[in-house]
Curated annotation (Swiss-Prot):
GO terms for biological process: L-methionine salvage from methylthioadenosine. Keywords: Amino-acid biosynthesis, Cytoplasm, Isomerase, Methionine biosynthesis, Nucleus. Its EC number is 5.3.1.23. Belongs to the eIF-2B alpha/beta/delta subunits family. MtnA subfamily. The active site is at 254 (proton donor). The record marks 174 as: Transition state stabilizer. This is Methylthioribose-1-phosphate isomerase. It comes from the Eukaryota. PANTHER family: METHYLTHIORIBOSE-1-PHOSPHATE ISOMERASE (PTHR43475:SF1).
């Protein structure tokens, strides 16, 4: 059974505090939007899909007990609070897309004279809760599509491991599993599907400095699932791909531009460069909500920069020389030219065909 990072019932929201993992499993109560903004900004919850779900559900929890005088006041509350939540971590596009969808819904409900303010509130709550269920279903579809794509490609290339009946070794970066989504995971969902098919020989995960999401979170999930797994340092990736017959790299995404350029956790770009050198397929696994067709390329993606302390300290212990300057971008952008395919819940697309394909899907 996969881990549960989000516990929700109408009027109640708790998130697994990922800052405490793997040493302690503790749930934090989110009572409203201010709590939601804080747990996202402090990275107690992280992962683009999970950020969107927690942000929207924090608003649902806040407005659930309230009695609004009229539909206008409810609409204003929804729009203002959602725009505020987007500011918690701006690189991840999922929160912005979810906010835009819910604001559009609120405006439509506001104009609908057939419903009153109470009905409007309940329709809004239903919509936010539907996002939670959809995320899990989308992740399972991503897992199935990704596993199929990897197995088909490596079978053609003859990169399955001898004597393992078509099983593969894969590498992943950061955390993209149940802890980063509503459940199952994106890139780690692909790994999970390979395991369910009996086709996962081994998974390697990077430590993912400076926040150590790979060492703290992905390793935690892999041990929990009892998958055959090995943790490697970020600086070991080139040696790993040269020595260990890795069949594919699969990572997540915080924002994908319309040309396929992908913003993901810092370190992703260099892994893609190394994978290209070693002729290892490099896949991005992301829901359609992570694809931003309004952005033409990666140069237009805003990259969040984090505090120096995340680099200079581990917990309360300083590991860097006092007085040293730090540069700590949370994400980098991998050019589309390094990406083999973008795995979504609706299929796997080459970066060059992404914009046209997604536009058609959204119009259908």
């Amino acid at each position: 059974m996969s881990l549960q990072s989000i516990k929700y019932s109408r009027g109640s929201l708790e998130i697994l505090d990922q800052l405490l993992l793997p040493g302690q499993s503790k749930y934090v109560v989110v009572r409203g939007v201010e709590d939601g903004w804080k747990v996202i900004n402090k990275m107690q919850v992280r992962g683009a899909p999970a950020i969107a779900i927690v942000g929207c559900l924090s608003l649902a929890v806040e407005i659930n007990p309230e009695d609004f005088e009229n539909k206008k006041s409810l609409r204003q509350e929804i729009e203002g609070k959602l725009n505020y939540l987007v500011s918690a971590r701006p690189t991840a596009v999922n929160m912005k897309i979810a906010a835009d969808e819910l604001i559009t819904l609120a405006n439509e409900l506001y104009k609908d004279e057939a419903i009153d303010v109470t009905q409007m509130k309940h329709r809004f709550l239903d919509a936010t809760e539907a996002m939670l269920k959809k995320d899990i279903a989308d992740n399972r579809a991503i897992g199935a599509n990704g596993a199929q794509a990897i197995l088909q490609r490596v079978a053609k290339a003859g990169k399955t491991t001898a004597g393992t009946t078509g099983s593969v070794r894969v590498l992943t970066h950061c955390n993209t599993g149940s802890l980063a989504t509503a459940g199952y995971g994106t890139a780690l969902g692909v790994v999970r599907q390979l395991a369910e098919l009996g086709k996962l020989e081994h998974v390697y995960c990077t430590e993912t400095r400076p926040y150590n999401q790979g060492a703290r979170l992905t390793a935690y999930e892999l041990v929990h699932e009892k998958f055959p797994a090995t943790l490697v340092l970020d600086s070991m990736v080139a040696a790993l791909l040269r020595a260990k017959n890795v069949a594919a790299v699969v990572v997540g995404a915080d924002r994908v531009a319309s040309n396929g350029d992908t913003a993901n956790k810092i370190g992703t770009y260099q892994i893609a460069v190394v994978a290209k050198h070693h002729d290892v397929p490099f896949y991005v696994a992301a829901p359609l909500t992570s694809i931003d067709l309004a952005i033409p390329g990666g140069d237009h993606i805003i990259i969040e920069e984090r505090p120096d302390r995340e680099m200079t300290h581990v917990g309360e212990h300083r590991i860097a020389a006092p007085g040293i300057n730090c540069w700590n971008p949370a994400f980098d952008v991998t050019p589309a030219s390094l990406i083999t395919g973008i795995i979504t819940e609706r299929g796997v697309f080459k970066p060059a065909e992404l914009k046209e394909a997604i536009t058609k899907l959204l119009e259908s």
